[in-house]
Structure formats: structure tokens, C-alpha cells
Swiss-Prot record, chain A:
UniProt region (Basic motif), positions on chain: 166-186
PROSITE patterns hit by this protein: BZIP, BZIP_BASIC, DOG1
Description of how the protein assembles with itself and partners: Interacts with GRXC7/ROXY1. Interacts with BOP1 and BOP2.
Record protein name field: Transcription factor PERIANTHIA
Family (UniProt): Belongs to the bZIP family.
Protein's organism: Arabidopsis thaliana (Mouse-ear cress)
Single Gene Ontology MF annotation: cis-regulatory region sequence-specific DNA binding
UniProtKB/Swiss-Prot annotation, chain B:
GO biological process: negative regulation of DNA-templated transcription; negative regulation of transcription by RNA polymerase II
Motif (Responsive for interaction with TGA factors): 137-140
Protein species of origin: Arabidopsis thaliana (Mouse-ear cress)
Tissue: Weakly expressed throughout the inflorescence apical meristem and in young buds. Localized to the tapetum and middle layers.
Protein name per the record: Glutaredoxin-C8
């Protein structure tokens, strides 16, 4: 994210520089195309010829050229310095500059770790040449400049002298610039080296994690339920992703149906389809709960902002009704009463289940702490095992709570569907979907926020 | 609405014919005991004192302003028999082990409504409150 923000503004700058370079010389325009990036040599080799062939008039033009060239070099330096702060960025940046990949560059380089690293390796070459050329160019430019001066004002000794001094000063400046450039290069190479080591570490970690994973899997392969739990969680996530895509498609249909003033009967078909699709996710969650209740309770299959609002493995029905608010008006008095009652009863049911969960935690705590703890904890193994079995039994209730919570959600949606007209229900589904989309977008933004 | 009629129907079925035919499975005194216990109050909950879902349903009724009569089966002398009979009434032939949601069981106006999910579903679809009003458990 950051790199794309950074690189975009540089590109026009780069272009403007090269167009400066050839300003006022239309005959050089054709060279504009083949000259890539900072490979100035070709241009420089040609420039003196052009200048000598032309009159003094070009002197000033060339001065600008030089300054701009210098400025451009400075620009490059700034970019390099900016880039050195994050070596991934540099890689992408230099890649862009070196090969003039403007649009797709970032995306391509970003596509995977390996890609970007190989790009970085390639680009280190680019950087080397471009910085070197940068300093060489200046010398060449100076040479050309000087020769040109001599050609135009060869009789004036003082002029030559002052030009010598200027040349010396510029040479000194060049040396200084070259030294700085070498230091930067060193730092950059060091940075690359660091990232290479970091990558190697990450790869090592990944390998170890994979090995552990396979060990765990092999270790419990005798215990089928465990393996099934792992597979079950995985397959739930798969199913959920599939469900989300299907839901999105249905919502799109519904939206276009509402916008195009579709007839009530046709709209009802779409609304009923969304409703029964909701039933499908509750069915899937039911299976997931049986497989791994803690996974469903954790909500790891949802985005962070969705998780923030999560209650017993899903949304709060009463909250959903609050979201709908005045988005589905106008409601008749009867509908209004129905919605109010629904909100109240879902709130009461939620409170009851929450209190049941609290009781569950409390009794689990008591069960686990009532077994003898402390110094003579190993004294009574049977006592310990008995309490553990009891605690296991209590944890089994968790599944029931999750199932009840999902039933509550499902019933609330169904009741909402019954209270509202088809058109209102369609709008309600769209509002709910938009709200969840916003939560997901918020999560993405939050995860991508710059962190210092 | 559909839940209410369904449960009432199944209960009456159990009471009238099935029970008569299976005297050995349903000792008549246990059923009679359940019936009399269920008639004690407008709302009666058969519960287990350590059950957290039972705790939740008690809180649900109290949250609605109803004060139910609660029978903690683990503290009653014939609790186990009553529990078994209730599971039969609910249609859980496999027993309590495979369906932990069986208890609590709720009776309103002497008639069985069902376990937690039935009670919650009828609350959400708006049929529970009229039922409670009819039974005299709720005034407003």
C-alpha cells in the first residue's frame, strides 16, 4: 500500500526531467523514445555534436540541460534516500525507474515475496549502473560544456581560467557526489542483505511451522475426531467463502431488481432466495459448531471489525434491527409495533443467553478450582480426573448455547421477513449487506493503516 | 404459531393413546405427577440446578416479568424418573446424553411448550406473549 502511494507521484517527475533534457531541440525528439531511464550516455554522446553544429545560442540551452540533469540526479538521490528507508519500496521504485514500468510495476512486484525479492536483486544492478552513470554523465557533460566554451570563446584567456576554476569546482562537487553515492549504494546493499537474511529467517520459520503442522497431523492421525476437526474448520472456511460469494451475487440481483422497479412477484422470488440462503449459512454454522465450537466462537472466519461486534459466534439480532432503523420506512403502525416487539424479544433472548453463558463460565471456574490445587495437587488423581470430566461435560453445553444463538438469529430474520412487505424486506437485506460490507471495508482499512 | 399447535398436539397424543399403550415405559403415576406439577403455576420450568441453559431460560422469563415455578429435578426424590418421562414427552427417544438441549422443559398454562429453542422461537415469532397472557402469567 505504502509503496504504491509513494511511487505514483515520482513517475511524472521523471518524465518531465527527460523532456527537459531535450527541450528546444526538435531534431532530438526521435531519441527521446529509445533513451530509457538514466542511460544518459547516448544522449550525451550526441549532444556535443548538435551543439557544435549549431550556434552559441545553444549554450544557454545546454546550461539548462546540465542543471536539469543535475537536478534530475538530485531527484534520483532523494528517491533513493526515500527508498532506502524501506528496501521493499526501493526495489519497486528502482524497478519502475530502470525499466519504466509505470502502471503494472507495483502490482506485479507486489504479487509475492519471491517476486519482489528477485526484482530487488535485479534492481540492485539497475541502481548501480544508474548511480554510476549519473556521476559519469556529469563529467561528460562538463567535458562537452568546456569544449564548447573553448570553441566559442577560445581567445579569451580569463574566461578559460574562470571556466577552469568552474570545472575544478564541478569536478570536486562530482567527486563529493560520487562519494556520497557510493556510501548510499553501500547502505542500500546492506539493506538488501538484511532483507535477504530476514527472508531466509521467515522461510526457515515457515518450514518449521509446516513440519510441526505435519507432525501434529501425524500425531493425531489415530484420533480421527481431531483430524476431522482440523478438516472441518478448513472446510467451513471454504464453505463460508463460497457462501459469501453467492450471497454477494444474490444481493447484486436484488439491488438491480429494486432499482429497476421489478414487479412484486419477481422481487419476492429474489427475496425468498436470499432468505433461504441465510438458512444455508446457519446450517453450515451448525455443522461447524459440532466440529469445533471454539473456532466458531472465536469468529476467526470473520474480519476484525465484524468480530468486534460478535456475540456468541455471530451478529446480535437486536443490533441488526437497530441498523435497519429508518432505512425501510414508511412502515405502517402495525409493522412498527411488530418490529418493536421483535427488537424487545430478541434483546430479552440475547440477555438470557448471555446470562446463561456467564453462569457456564462461573460454574466451569468453580469446577476447575474446586479440585485440590497447590502443593499436594498430585495427591488425588481420581479427584482431579473427576473434576476434569465434569468440566468437559459443562463445556459440552457451549455447543448448545451457540446453537441457540444461531436459532435466535435465524428466527429474527424470518420474523422480520414476515413483518415487512417484499419490497421492504428487499431493502432491509440490502441495508444489512451494506452495513456488513462497511464493517469489512473498515477492517481492511484498519489492517492497511500505516504503522510507525 | 405452528410450534404451539404442534407441541400441544403431540402432548395430547402422548397423554391419551401412547401412554395407555406403553404402561411399562410411562408409569402412570410419573405422568400424573408431571401433570400436577405443571399445573401448579401459570409457568412451570423443569430444570436441573447445575444446568446453564436452565439458568438462561429462568432469566428469560424473569426478564419478561414472569415468575415461573421451578422444579429442580436433581434435587427431587423422583427427579430421574420425571426427567426420563419428560424426554419421552419431548420425543427424544435416544435419551438425555445425545440431546443436552432437552432440559429445561417449559409448561405454560399446564400445557407443554417445549425446550429452550421452542420457547425462544415462539418468543421471537410473537406467540409466547399471548400464550403467557392467556395463562395469566402476564398482565400487560
Amino acid at each position: 500500500m505504502q509503496s504504491s502511494f509513494k511511487t505514483v507521484p515520482f513517475t511524472p517527475d521523471f518524465y518531465s526531467q527527460s523532456s527537459y533534457f531535450f527541450r528546444g531541440d526538435s531534431c532530438l525528439e526521435e531519441f527521446h523514445q529509445p533513451v530509457n531511464g538514466f542511460h544518459h550516455e547516448e544522449a550525451i554522446d550526441l549532444s556535443p555534436n548538435v551543439t557544435i553544429a549549431s550556434a552559441n545560442l545553444h549554450y544557454t540551452t545546454f546550461d539548462t540541460v546540465m542543471d536539469c540533469g543535475g537536478g534530475g540526479g538530485g531527484g534520483l538521490r532523494e528517491r533513493l534516500e526515500g527508498g532506502e528507508e524501506e528496501c521493499l519500496d526501493t526495489g519497486q521504485l528502482v524497478y519502475q525507474k530502470g525499466t519504466r514500468l509505470v502502471g503494472g510495476g507495483v502490482g506485479e512486484v507486489n504479487s509475492s515475496w519471491c517476486d519482489s525479492v528477485s526484482a530487488m536483486a535485479d534492481n540492485s544492478q539497475h541502481t548501480d549502473t544508474s548511480t554510476d552513470i549519473d556521476t559519469d554523465d556529469k563529467t561528460q557533460l562538463n567535458g562537452g560544456h568546456q569544449g564548447m566554451l573553448l570553441a566559442t570563446n577560445c581567445s579569451d584567456q580569463s574566461n578559460v581560467k574562470s571556466s577552469d576554476q568552474r570545472t575544478l569546482r564541478r569536478l570536486a562537487q562530482n567527486r563529493e557526489a560520487a562519494r556520497k553515492s557510493r556510501l548510499r549504494k553501500k547502505a542500500y546493499v546492506q539493506q538488501l542483505e538484511n532483507s535477504r537474511i530476514r527472508l531466509a529467517q521467515l522461510e526457515e520459520e515457515l518450514k518449521r511451522a509446516r513440519q510441526q503442522g505435519s507432525l501434529v497431523e501425524r500425531g493425531v492421525s489415530a484420533d480421527h475426531t481431531h483430524l476431522a476437526a482440523g478438516n472441518g474448520v478448513f472446510s467451513f472456511e471454504l464453505e463460508y467463502t463460497r457462501w459469501k460469494e453467492e450471497h454477494q451475487r444474490m444481493i447484486n440481483d436484488l439491488r438491480s431488481g429494486v432499482n429497476s422497479q421489478l414487479g412484486d412477484n419477481d422481487l419476492r422470488v429474489l427475496v425468498d432466495a436470499v432468505m433461504s440462503h441465510y438458512d444455508e449459512i446457519f446450517r453450515l454454522k451448525g455443522i461447524g459448531t459440532k466440529v469445533d465450537v471454539f473456532h466458531m466462537l472465536s469468529g476467526m472466519w470473520k474480519t476484525p471489525a465484524e468480530r468486534f461486534f460478535m456475540w456468541l459466534g455471530g451478529f446480535r439480532s437486536s443490533e441488526l434491527l437497530k441498523i435497519l432503523g429508518n432505512h425501510v420506512d414508511p412502515l405502517t403502525d402495525q409493522q412498527l409495533i411488530g418490529i418493536c416487539n421483535l427488537q424487545q424479544s430478541s434483546q430479552q433472548a440475547e440477555d438470557a443467553l448471555s446470562q446463561g453463558m456467564e453462569a457456564l463460565q462461573q460454574s466451569l471456574l468453580e469446577t476447575l478450582s474446586s479440585a485440590s490445587m497447590g502443593p499436594n495437587s498430585s495427591a488425588n488423581v481420581a479427584d482431579y480426573m473427576g473434576h476434569m470430566a465434569m468440566a468437559m461435560g459443562k463445556l459440552g453445553t457451549l455447543e448448545n448455547f451457540l446453537r441457540q444463538a444461531d436459532l435466535l438469529r435465524q428466527q429474527t430474520l424470518q420474523q422480520l421477513h414476515r413483518i415487512l412487505t417484499t419490497r421492504q424486506a428487499a431493502r432491509a437485506f440490502l441495508v444489512i449487506h451494506d452495513y456488513i460490507s462497511r464493517l469489512r471495508a473498515l477492517s481492511s482499512l484498519w489492517l492497511a493503516r500505516p504503522r510507525d | 404459531m405452528q410450534y404451539k399447535t404442534e407441541t400441544r398436539g403431540s402432548l395430547s397424543y402422548n397423554n391419551n393413546s401412547k401412554v395407555m399403550n406403553n404402561m411399562n415405559v410411562f408409569p402412570s403415576e410419573t405422568l400424573a405427577k408431571i401433570e400436577s406439577m405443571a399445573a401448579e403455576n401459570a409457568v412451570v420450568i423443569f430444570s436441573v440446578s447445575t444446568c446453564c441453559m436452565c439458568h438462561a431460560i429462568k432469566r428469560l422469563f424473569r426478564g419478561m416479568g414472569v415468575s415461573p415455578a421451578v422444579h429442580e429435578l436433581d434435587l427431587l426424590p423422583y427427579g430421574v424418573e420425571i426427567h426420563r418421562a419428560l424426554l419421552r414427552l419431548l420425543g427424544c427417544s435416544s435419551g438425555g446424553a445425545t440431546s443436552p438441549g432437552a432440559l429445561p422443559v417449559v409448561f405454560i398454562g399446564g400445557k407443554m411448550v417445549g425446550a429452550m429453542e421452542r420457547v425462544m422461537a415462539s418468543h421471537i415469532n410473537g406467540s409466547l406473549v399471548p400464550l403467557l397472557k392467556d395463562a395469566g402469567a402476564l398482565w400487560l
